[in-house]
UniProtKB/Swiss-Prot annotation:
NCBIfam families: S18. This is Small ribosomal subunit protein bS18. Belongs to the bacterial ribosomal protein bS18 family. GO terms for biological process: translation. Pfam families: Ribosomal_S18 (PF01084). Signal peptide: none annotated. The keyword Ribonucleoprotein applies. Binds as a heterodimer with protein bS6 to the central domain of the 16S rRNA, where it helps stabilize the platform of the 30S subunit. Part of the 30S ribosomal subunit. Forms a tight heterodimer with protein bS6.
């Protein structure tokens, strides 16, 4: 029986040496929100605590400025 090998998660922001996450970088921020508009937790993305806080702050600022939607499921 073959075992499933789970790939180790790593923080992309630490690896790239990002100083601060910019709220105007919508392409990057969209990778960290779900289809329904929720912020993806760090245990799933592998983002470190420092950058997860910056990410949440940037997403909330972008939402406030209408750069990102609060939700995509309008019915």
């Amino acid at each position: 029986m073959a075992r499933y090998f789970r790939r180790r998660k790593f923080c992309r922001f630490t690896a790239e040496g990002v100083a601060e996450i910019d709220y105007k970088d919508i392409v990057t921020l969209k990778n960290y929100i779900t289809e329904s508009g929720k912020i993806v937790p760090s245990r799933i993305t592998g983002t470190s605590a420092k950058y997860q806080r910056q990410l949440a702050r940037a997403i909330k600022r972008a939402r406030y400025l209408s750069l990102l939607p609060y939700t995509d499921l309008h019915q």
